[in-house]
A protein has these predicted regions:
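Helix-centered, glycine/charged polyanion-binding patches within enzymatic domains
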Residues: 1-6, 191-264, 272-276
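Charged, often Cys/His-bearing segments associated with DNA-binding zinc-finger transcription factors
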Residues: 1-45, 58, 87, 98-111, ...
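Flexible, active-site-adjacent loop/turn segments at secondary-structure boundaries
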Residues: 8-11, 15, 21-25, 33, ...
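Short capping/connector residues at structural and topological boundaries
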Residues: 15-18, 22, 28, 32, ...
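Pocket-edge structural micro-motifs
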Residues: 27, 117-119, 291
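Polybasic low-complexity intrinsically disordered regions
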Residues: 40-71, 75-79, 86-215, 219-220, ...
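General structural signal for alpha-helix termini and helix-helix connectors
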Residues: 79-83, 268-271
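C-terminal extensions of enzymes
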Residues: 266-301
Length: 301
């Protein structure tokens, strides 16, 4: 007897693909009041700020989602407001670039009982591209973004941007400092985090670090290395594959999946040239990914 073969509903399939490109713009009734909520309030020094931070954040989010330069982002914001029948001023590209470094991004969501950490590189555009063309790959440079991912809802709960020379173990402490991790939390990472400094920080915060020990790892009697000694004994008796299975080490692939989604959605390079702006740009992408995983309801008319 032939196996049942499901028939493809091509009409529905084509409609769903078309819906992926649909655009919904919702403008609240209080948009005009929030757009200029500062009302020209004077800052600490210099000229008063005209636009509040959330207006600039809106423009920068549009820039990242649609991969636009800042000037084209300004044109997009003007067009959306014009088509919606709303007459509001739009910040220019210089304002977006200048105030980006001072923006306060939203807090990271709270994690459950486990967080998976990893890092990836983001290329830098600008003068380095010309230097790479002339002098070869030795002049190529990038920035590293370190992320902590909660495996259950696939949300990014920690983020940090460092220069390319920073080792993953050196970013372990400041990365976890950006997350709200309770005592007893489990942190999963690759072999790059098999360092005494990482275990010392995990022991200080009463966290459990799960990382495969090196092939020639030896047991040390320091109290901070208790989890590492336990992992070494388990690997010697069970073997590395069985130890990974008992520790559910395969969850580490979720961090790699988050890196792939980050680059697939926003590209593998950074548009900003200044270091503070590069940090904000990379972390803003992570926050946008979180917003896509936690959609909000739009009130209907």
């Amino acid at each position: 007897m032939n196996a049942f073969k499901q028939k493809m509903h091509w009409k529905k399939y084509n409609r769903e693909l078309a819906d992926r490109g649909s655009l919904t713009v919702y403008l609240g009734d209080d948009l005009a009041s929030k757009w200029a909520s500062n009302n020209g309030a004077a800052a600490d020094r210099g000229r008063p700020e005209v636009y509040p931070d959330h207006v600039l954040l809106l423009g920068l989010v549009l820039q990242q989602v649609y991969r636009l330069p800042l000037r084209q982002t300004v044109g997009l914001m003007r067009s959306v407001l014009k088509l919606s029948g709303v007459a509001l001023p739009v910040p220019d590209s210089s304002t977006l670039s200048r105030r980006r470094r001072h923006l306060v991004l939203p807090h990271w969501p709270k994690s459950g009982r486990c967080v998976v950490i990893d890092s990836t590189g983001l290329q830098i555009r600008g003068p380095n591209t010309w230097l790479t063309t002339v002098h070869g790959r030795k002049r190529r440079t990038h920035r590293k973004i370190h992320l902590g991912v909660d495996p259950d809802p696939s949300l990014i709960v920690a983020g940090l941007v460092t220069p390319c020379q920073t080792h993953d173990s050196e970013a372990f402490d400041p990365l976890l400092a950006t997350a709200e991790l309770p005592a007893g939390h489990e942190v999963i990472g690759d072999g790059a985090y098999d360092r005494r400094c990482c275990y010392a920080y995990a022991s200080k915060r009463r966290l459990r670090l799960v990382t495969p020990p090196r092939s020639r790892a030896v047991i040390h009697l320091q109290p901070d290395l208790t989890d590492r000694n336990r992992a070494i004994r388990a690997v010697r008796s069970l073997g590395t594959p069985e130890w990974k299975r008992t520790q559910h080490y395969a969850r580490r692939s979720l961090a790699e999946a988050a890196m792939h989604r980050l680059k697939a959605a926003f590209g593998a390079g950074l548009r900003s040239r200044l270091w503070p702006n590069q940090q904000k740009e990379a972390l803003l992408r992570a926050h946008i990914l979180n917003s896509w995983n936690t959609p909000k309801r739009i009130p209907s008319d």
